[in-house]
Amino acid sequence: MTPAGKRILVMAGGTGGHVFPALAVAKYLAQQGWQVRWLGTADRMEARLVPQYGFDIDFIDIKGVRGNGLIRKLAAPFKVVRSILQAKAVIAEFKPDVVLGMGGFASGPGGVAARLAGIPLVLHEQNAIPGMTNKLLSRIATQVLCAFKNTFTTVKAKVVGNPIRQELIALGAQPKPEADKALKVLVVGGSLGAKVFNDLMPEAVAILSQQQSVTVWHQVGKDNLAGVKAAYQQHGQDGGVNIAEFIDDMEAAYRWADVVLCRAGALTVSELAAVGLPSILVPYPHAVDDHQTRNGQVLVEAGAAFLLPQAILDVNKLAGKLQLLANDRTELARMGQRARDVAVLDATEQVAAVCISLAEKG
């Protein structure tokens, strides 16, 4: 049993792909009696989200430098030094037993500050291709963890999967209900929606509905509701379509769906595996190092997903893939089972166990 009173500083921010896996680990350790504190930046999503889960958060002043202008790049070294000193002050005051970095701007300075203070540093990389921060920090980290095989080529890393919510793991273990006559398509393009899905789905559904009964739950993103609703109506498809700017209850959405049309973010791929759902993946084409394509290959190679590059995606290709799945419900069920077969269901516990072990040694 983990001794109570241990302290962990969690560094994760910027996107849900970093923050939500970190929250899963933080909640697990807090339930074991650990004191959790967060390090992030004040202008990103962690500033709003982390306090809602009851964790204290400290901020440092740091921004990314990839792709920025010359003046900003020249000033970057001085800002990095300042942010390391800010992180060092947080560490000196909190005195963590271990520091966990899970991506985002704050992880870089925080990771360096942890090692300067002689505190064990655990890194977790969610994507199949490591981000710049984790790539650099991996050289000095005490332990490197990753979600997918062959993520790191220059350091030894342990594959542990991506921590996800226990509710989704439990959902995947439940028996699948008998399929309805209508194919139920969940469309998720992230919190901002995906323009390509918003543009293509109304017409694709119109084509599909000529041969097959279909219902759609479509997350369109902020400020896109009216336009997408009008597009479905224009194609005569507003009756079987549920349109939302944002889906708050993804557990309910996954439970409802037969197939998911989505991007291939690391957390999305891990959730699809955990809940055992087949998918049509369209990787975000501007993702750094095209990491979403590599993420999606995990499900594609398992026979659990189709991957359609956005550059070649059109209405007919999308409608064709949906028709293929609608026509063969047995294969659809097999794809869902293959997704579940590649899921790593104890990722949260594995990440926590590494932190616990290092804290006890220290």
From Swiss-Prot:
Highest taxon above the source species: Bacteria
Q: Which InterPro entries match?
A: GlcNAc_MurG (IPR006009), Glyco_trans_28_C (IPR007235), GlycoTrans_28_N (IPR004276)
Q: Please provide an example of a Pfam family that matches this protein in its UniProt record.
A: Glyco_tran_28_C
Q: Which GO terms describe its molecular function?
A: UDP-N-acetyl-D-glucosamine:N-acetylmuramoyl-L-alanyl-D-glutamyl-meso-2,6-diaminopimelyl-D-alanyl-D-alanine-diphosphoundecaprenol 4-beta-N-acetylglucosaminlytransferase activity; undecaprenyldiphospho-muramoylpentapeptide beta-N-acetylglucosaminyltransferase activity
What main location does UniProt list?
A: membrane
The EC number(s) attached to this protein equal: 2.4.1.227
Annotated residues for binding of UDP-N-acetyl-alpha-D-glucosamine: 15-17, 127, 165, 191, 247, 266-271, 292
Which SUPFAM superfamilies did the record assign?
UDP-Glycosyltransferase/glycogen phosphorylase
GO CC, any one term: plasma membrane
Residue runs in coiled coils: none
In the record, biological process GO terms are: carbohydrate metabolic process; cell division; cell wall organization; lipid glycosylation; peptidoglycan biosynthetic process; regulation of cell shape
| Localization per record | Cell inner membrane
* Its membrane topology: Peripheral membrane protein
The pathway to which it is assigned is: Cell wall biogenesis; peptidoglycan biosynthesis
Give the keywords, sorted.
Answer: Cell cycle, Cell division, Cell inner membrane, Cell membrane, Cell shape, Cell wall biogenesis/degradation, Glycosyltransferase, Membrane, Peptidoglycan synthesis, Transferase
Q: Which reaction does it catalyse?
A: di-trans,octa-cis-undecaprenyl diphospho-N-acetyl-alpha-D-muramoyl-L-alanyl-D-glutamyl-meso-2,6-diaminopimeloyl-D-alanyl-D-alanine + UDP-N-acetyl-alpha-D-glucosamine = di-trans,octa-cis-undecaprenyl diphospho-[N-acetyl-alpha-D-glucosaminyl-(1->4)]-N-acetyl-alpha-D-muramoyl-L-alanyl-D-glutamyl-meso-2,6-diaminopimeloyl-D-alanyl-D-alanine + UDP + H(+)
The protein's job, in short, is:
Cell wall formation. Catalyzes the transfer of a GlcNAc subunit on undecaprenyl-pyrophosphoryl-MurNAc-pentapeptide (lipid intermediate I) to form undecaprenyl-pyrophosphoryl-MurNAc-(pentapeptide)GlcNAc (lipid intermediate II).
Q: Which family does it belong to?
A: Belongs to the glycosyltransferase 28 family. MurG subfamily.
| Name of the protein in its database record | UDP-N-acetylglucosamine--N-acetylmuramyl-(pentapeptide) pyrophosphoryl-undecaprenol N-acetylglucosamine transferase
* Organism whose genome encodes this protein: Shewanella baltica (strain OS185)
